[in-house]
């Protein structure tokens, strides 16, 4: 059994019902929209974000559940899907999860409007049911995701990202949505504010570890879904590179920056950069940082009694840092 399927076992029934509710939440009177959303549902991913909502809700309430939890999971998945559709337009990407992206099939104009539609459906699902606490959590995430993306674009132009700014970017771009999932899971079953914020922090730590793992893939010798060196080719300043720039000599620093700025499409130079980062401790340092965040997430779970839901969250943490793709 695949790790994600193993993690899903305690909430298998909830996830199956969620899929039906999620489909219903996207329905429209416009036939074109229904064709597109049907296409989106058919090419679903691992659905890790709804899994976080359900597992946290069950863990903090001793297996309890609420209709609000389904709505919270649907809101999260609607917002997440909207951001993916918009991301593909921004990145001019023609593929998503092995399928053609929405913009590849229906062009950018329709893709942007579909993303807007999904975003509005998510917000209205909360408003119509007066789930204002859940709406606030997801709205904070949407704001931070936009800020993180723009901060990265601003800093990428000069390649002057410090480690502090790097962590702020990945916290906003990646971790904030997982934090919202965990916070929404707790809030949906009536957990107190302290627990909601603790679960948000738990999700944030996992999200940061998740993104750091993604950064490490760029330097991996193993064959994975993501091509080696793609971040360097796209001039993305990731933690292994940032740490190496902070610890090497001025001469080496100039060579590194010049390589990323002007020779990022030269395969030989990209390989040289990867080798230099590896030889100068960039991978070891980054792996240590990833494990630091993993341990912070584990420390939060220690506050909760043993349960199948807690076990799945522990497995989720391991999966995030040990996954091959």
Language model features with spans:
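All-alpha prenyltransferase/terpene-synthase fold signal
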Residues: 1-325
